[in-house]
From Swiss-Prot:
<dbReference type="InterPro" id="IPR001986">
    <property type="entry name" value="Enolpyruvate_Tfrase_dom"/>
</dbReference>
<keyword id="KW-0573">Peptidoglycan synthesis</keyword>
<keyword id="KW-0808">Transferase</keyword>
<dbReference type="GO" id="GO:0009252">
    <property type="term" value="P:peptidoglycan biosynthetic process"/>
</dbReference>
<dbReference type="Pfam" id="PF00275">
    <property type="entry name" value="EPSP_synthase"/>
</dbReference>
<feature type="binding site">
    <location>
        <position position="304"/>
    </location>
    <ligand>
        <name>UDP-N-acetyl-alpha-D-glucosamine</name>
    </ligand>
</feature>
<keyword id="KW-0133">Cell shape</keyword>
<dbReference type="InterPro" id="IPR005750">
    <property type="entry name" value="UDP_GlcNAc_COvinyl_MurA"/>
</dbReference>
<dbReference type="InterPro" id="IPR013792">
    <property type="entry name" value="RNA3'P_cycl/enolpyr_Trfase_a/b"/>
</dbReference>
<feature type="binding site">
    <location>
        <position position="326"/>
    </location>
    <ligand>
        <name>UDP-N-acetyl-alpha-D-glucosamine</name>
    </ligand>
</feature>
<comment type="similarity">
    <text>Belongs to the EPSP synthase family. MurA subfamily.</text>
</comment>
<dbReference type="GO" id="GO:0071555">
    <property type="term" value="P:cell wall organization"/>
</dbReference>
<dbReference type="GO" id="GO:0051301">
    <property type="term" value="P:cell division"/>
</dbReference>
<comment type="pathway">
    <text>Cell wall biogenesis; peptidoglycan biosynthesis.</text>
</comment>
<keyword id="KW-0961">Cell wall biogenesis/degradation</keyword>
<feature type="active site" description="Proton donor">
    <location>
        <position position="116"/>
    </location>
</feature>
<feature type="binding site">
    <location>
        <begin position="22"/>
        <end position="23"/>
    </location>
    <ligand>
        <name>phosphoenolpyruvate</name>
    </ligand>
</feature>
């Protein structure tokens, strides 16, 4: 099994270009199910999760052609309505095919999903929403089955904002009869990107990016060419790494307007952050200042950046409190950072008390999930000595060529068997 080996202490300098966003690409590719024709997607990242959803679409009968960063999905050949366990078990985002399948074909059978083990992340709100649109739902033998002659518009309220729930029901409602109003929606940029794509396909979606989304159903959608937006979490990861190593890095191909929570918090740590056209320049400050962090739904500080910022706080001057409000069980990286000398304690399950230390030391560590693995890479970059990260398949789920990009910035990092 692959490992990543890092010799720390190198200052990162240079320019890095950000890939397309995994969390945008997955729902966009799933939306191709809604169309009886060929969709073209550009700026698609080459990630394990993206490969998984392409494999799932192929299994349903869709045609799939790939080029450099480009994917063509032809939904005209879809003849299956079942997303099998073997294809769904590794990735929670597979649930995103449920809404499009039942909307277009009136029937869907999708295995309960897998993915990162960072909390329950139940699909209850997806199912309640589909029921409100007129689908009958049964769960049996580990599969969700949804049936409807044709979905009918309705008003749906989310108990808490849910990104995939908002996306799933927004896609389903595009082909429903009448108007659907989704309330207390998640507001992430990836949701806005999906709504924009659906509208290019002929849907009538308004309000994406706000708490209330309105969808006027149409009889059918048409093929379109869709560009995947940049990955704000990948951009944030490189920005934190630049600050942590005292480096000077230009992060290009990103959208700073979607990264306010990350940029503001990074500035509070003393880093110099300059916003340019389609990019951000980050320079490490004279010292790393401690700051408290509370994860929140967008536009607040993203939970997907919590682990990376914890490394920065671990080597800061002072103490900080990190409050995780989005997912339970998302401090699994703490034990590994402690192995490297970090002074961190957990309180109540969702608070981390971080006391800054002068330096971390290299160690053998184990990645537990996607963002935890990114935090261990940053820790390895700043640590004295050699850090070896095991179970790096987590990294490949959400970061495209991570070690190559860091190497180009001057890091001593390599993948080994």
């Amino acid at each position: 099994m692959d490992k990543i080996e890092i010799r720390g202490g190198k200052r990162l300098t240079g320019e890095v270009r950000i890939s397309g966003a995994k969390n945008a690409a997955l729902p966009l590719l799933a939306s191709s199910i809604l169309v009886d024709g060929a969709m073209t997607f550009t700026n698609v990242p080459d990630l394990v999760d993206v490969r998984s959803i392409k494999m799932l679409l192929r299994d349903l009968g869709a045609g799939c052609e790939e080029g450099e960063g480009t994917v063509l999905i032809d939904g005209s050949g879809i003849h299956k309505i079942e997303a099998a366990y073997e294809l769904v078990r590794k990735m929670r985002a597979s649930i995103l095919v449920l809404g499009p399948l039942v909307a277009r074909f009136g029937h869907a059978r999708v295995s309960l999903p897998g993915g990162c083990a960072i909390g329950a992340r139940p699909v209850d709100m997806h199912l309640k929403g589909l029921k409100a649109l007129g689908a009958t739902i049964t769960i049996e033998n580990g599969y969700i089955e949804a049936k409807a002659d044709r979905l009918k518009g309705n008003e749906i309220y989310f108990d808490i904002p849910t990104v995939t729930g908002t996306e799933n029901l927004m896609m389903a409602a595009t082909l429903a009869k009448g108007t659907t109003v989704l309330r207390n929606c998640a507001r992430e940029p990836e949701i806005t990107a999906l709504a924009n794509a659906l509208n290019l396909m002929g849907a009538r979606v308004t309000g994406a990016g706000t708490a209330v989304i309105r969808i006027n159903g149409v009889d059918g959608l048409s093929p379109a060419t869709i560009h995947v937006i940049p990955d704000r979490i990948e951009a944030g990861t490189f920005m934190v790494a630049a600050a942590a190593t005292g480096g000077d890095v230009l992060v290009t191909g990103c959208e700073p307007e979607n990264m306010g929570g990350i940029i503001n918090k990074l500035r509070q740590t003393g880093a110099l952050v300059e916003i340019i056209d389609h990019g951000v320049k980050v320079s490490g400050g004279k010292s790393i200042l401690s700051t408290d962090i509370k994860t929140l739904p967008y536009p607040g500080f993203p939970t997907d950046m919590q682990a990376q910022f914890m490394v920065l706080m671990a080597i800061s001057q002072g103490n900080s409190v990190i409050h995780e409000t989005i997912f339970e069980n998302r401090f699994m990286h703490v034990n590994e950072l402690q192995r490297m000398g970090a002074d961190i304690s957990i309180s109540g399950g969702n608070y981390a008390m971080v006391r800054g230390v002068n330096a971390l030391s290299g160690a053998e560590v184990m990645a537990s999930d996607l963002r935890a693995s990114a935090s261990l890479v940053i820790a390895g970059l700043v640590a004295r000595g050699v850090t070896t990260i095991h179970r790096v398949y987590h990294i490949d789920r959400g970061y495209e060529a991570l070690e190559k990009k860091f190497s180009a910035l001057g890091a001593d990092i390599k993948r080994v068997k």
